[in-house]
Amino acid sequence: DTVKGLSPKGIRYLIATDYHGDHTTGSSFIDGIGEQVNFIAPQFAYDEILKGDNAFSKEIFVETLRDLGHTEEADAITRAAVPHPQFCFEDTMVLHLPPLTFEIRRMGGHSPATSAIFVPEEGVLFSSDVVSHTGGGMRDANLGEWIRALEWIESLPIKTIVPGHGDICGKDVATRQKERMVSIKGTMEEVLKKGLTKDETVADESFQKFFRADTSRGEYWLQQRKETFRIGIERVYDEVKADIG
């Protein structure tokens, strides 16, 4: 309702910046989606949505709500089908909507679909999970892509970042996140020198300092975060092993 009041024309475009449940589930509750409201998404997101709810972590989203006692909301989300985007892009798309321009760019990093939206006239970037106060989950990540995406953000003439999670911020948060990603890769490079197996490497205590989770979201969420963190470190292992040969 708040967004509707920003323009007499109401909502005209909805842009999904990822396929994860916290970026797609809300589209089920937008009046006129697919009709008055044009649904835009990266092709990667469209492909994942076609696979069904659990493919893009809707289950995690719903079960976290149940664990916190929000059963009515969880049931409503379970029943609501996520609509299919109508307009998709591989890498970039530009919306010319005078007086503003919306430059949409698939960045990758957090997931293959993760995209950002730059509004040059306002000096604003909607970064999705490329920038996140929580550091960002790595379950579907490629850290090399992520670091390059953050370097691109650092180069932009922007005053304001609307991150995927957390309060509106400046480029300092992007810089801190880049430093974190570089540190994770560097730690993996050092641990690999020990000659450990993949399982031993992933379990190495050196990585625990990078784990973050909002414990206020309940035990289910915490366990899911631990599991996705482990999967993320496995991905970093594969990525760094491939880099060093």
Q: At which residue positions do the language-model features occur?
A:
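A generic secondary-structure signal
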Residues: 2-6, 149-152
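Non-catalytic beta-strand/loop surface segments
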Residues: 87, 91-93
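C-terminal regulatory/interaction regions
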Residues: 193-245
